Amino acid sequence: MAFQAYHGVTGAQHQTNFNNLSAQGYRMISLSVYGDPHDGRYAAVWVQRAGPAWVAVHGVDSAGYQSFFNNWTAKGFVPVIVSATGAVNNAIFAAVFEQGIGGPWLARHGMTSGPVANANTFQHFVKTAADSKLIVRSVAIYGTASDRRYAAVWHANPRYVKWHVHPSDTGASYQTAFDAETQLPGYSLHAYRPAYVAVSDDQMYCSVFKDDVVGPWVARHGLTSSQYQTEFDAQNAAGFYPICVQGGGSGSNTRYAAIFAKQDVPSSRAWTMTGTAVPTLAALDHVMQSFMQANGVRAAQLAVAKNGVAKFSRAYTWAEPGYRVTQPSDRFLLASCSKMFLEAAVQSLYDAKKLTPATKVYPLLGFSGPADPRSNDITIQQLLDHMGGYDDTPTGSGFDPTYRMRFIAQSLGLSHPVTKLDVARYMYGKPLDFTPGTNNKYSNFGYLLAGAVVEKVTNTTFFNYVKTALLQPAGITEVEVLPTLASGRTNHQAIAEDEGMDKSPIDLASNLLVPAVYGGDGEINEVGDPNDGLAASAHALTQFIHLHAVWGNGPRAAGAARSGSTPGASTLAVSRWDGVDWACVVNTRDWPPSTSPTLDDLFDTSAPISPLSITHVLDTTPIP
């Protein structure tokens, strides 16, 4: 890529560079104005390539920028880069506008900093843009510490690239944000990248992170002019060029933030299907493709069986080049579809006369002295039926211990991550939400507690019992516990994607944020495997629900279904009345707002059936 870059030049020199470079077919991909607005300095990066018509402006005040904006947007141009420096009453602006930007867009300058609920704040417009399926293209932070201001541009986001903004960080807190954001999964197990890092004159950072792909990249911040030049030379020698350079401050106090890469235009995604094609069920492929491309989903599987015979097993990938192509045998996090394995395990222990539905769980586990005497009356079957006295929902306690494992460990004074029995001990010390057997309220914890009972009775881990007693005899191989930590994940496990972050339930001494899919959601998969933490292929689910109830305990349950949702997973398994069992697993539950087809369409099983659903295809296509 032929490029030209400079920094620290005056407005006059920038204009000279503009005249020379634009005449040679270069166009700006990065522009920054910084320092004293009466003597603003400029940094810019130009690349030599064809593109739409464009115009630029620099050194204008707020009114001048608004006039330029009004004039050129009326001619079909849209801002793509905006930068500003100075206090609100004397700020100057620099910007680049392009023609032919498709879709809706949003641009504002002079935005204040404040709560999302307050109109005219940057934070408010960030949320407004995200809710409108827009993505930030450029941002500037200017003003003063007591009167912070922002300018920004958002464009349409049809591919639903995930993005986050950190409005105002010191250098140290930006580094903390950087360390957390770049651990988030997407294209790879750790995929988010800094896409834009703006710097104010008092060296506050406004950063944008995205999960799109520009190949290898390097980011630096807090650089003096000479340090930036040294870094530039080193990266250039390694085949990188700056794709975003932003300055802040004046004279010797100037500092730069820079991002280097080998491409500035994010890679496009490609559609891939694996598994044996079934021409009569090609409509299923079309339904999955429409759903995944509309919602930015990189990986999913769909499997269909009839009377225990596999009829369709396909894996789908909508991802950038280099992403590991999803295979039909890959394991996806199951979320609550894990619960069917717990139910089958308990049923097998009923059949072996090692448990009865009336077995009281806490006495069996050796617990005594409950905070609520009713706890000792909870039976194993009540746990399976969500009648054990626990209500994780807001209508009850609103406390779901399966997602609060760090909190529980700290509350118990533990120096190690919790076990199933630790979580049970904590809940044994709390009052119930209702008398066991008198109500039906969904409870993840009830299944974790039942899993502890399975371990007690079998004297082995929950999943080892499931594997040896249920899976291996049936020849089902594509089920396992999904390791919580990214370091434990393997190539046959789909990359679970979620934007969430919080503190780790495993590293109790650390206050750093970790991705939700690596424990930041508060759950340790190895502890919550009976309720949430298993992984399997869609094919394995169809094998299992032919033999065991998809909902409840017992044999195949015709007309029943089970869904699952947790950070990094959306799943559904269905046993139909016509002998068809099907399952779909998706590697995320992060969805764009107000788009169609939605997950509700895809997973629709209730009349009226959506024509965009898997059920519609199965209802209208004979399965031999």
Language model region names:
Residues 23-26, 77, 134, 187, ...:
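Sec-exported extracytoplasmic/periplasmic mature domains
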